[in-house]
Amino acid sequence: TPEAVMQLAYEGAVYGESIGADIPSASVSKRILLAKEIVNRNRTRGISDTLDELVGLLGAGMQAVESIPFSLGVFYAVSGDVQKGLLAAVNGGDDADTNGSICGNICGAFSGVNALPKRWTSRIERENRIDFLPIAKQLLNR
C-alpha cells in the first residue's frame, strides 16, 4: 500500500540518518512524516492544494532534504498512480525534472510496468533503440 511505502521510506531515512555524517540540515525522516501529514490534511481539497502546501512547507528543490520528502508526498497523494504522479511532481515546479524522476520511479516501482501507457514505453524504446524489459529482468536477477 502507499501507506506501507511511506512507512518504509521513513524507516530507511531514519536508518540513513543514524549512520550518515552529522551535518547541519533538516531531517529527511521528519520531513517524510510532514509530507504524509500534509497529504492527509488535504485529501478532500485536491492535488493542486496539496502541491501548494507540499511546496510551501517542504520545498521542491534538488537537495535531498526537499526532493525526497516532496516526491514521496506526491506519490502518497496520488496513491502510486504513475501518470498522475509524474504530472503532479513536474507541476510542483522548482526542480521539476529531479522530482518527476524520483516520483516517477517510486510510482513505477509501486504500480509496475503495466501502469505506464504503452505509447510512452514504445516511443522511449523506439527513440532510444533500447529494449528495457531484458535489462529490467537482468537487474531483478542479480
Place the predicted regions along the sequence by residue.
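Phosphate-rich cofactor/ligand-interacting catalytic cores and adjacent structured alpha/beta frameworks
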Residues: 1-70, 76, 125, 129-142
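Catalytic phosphate/nucleotide-handling subdomain of diverse soluble enzymes
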Residues: 64-142
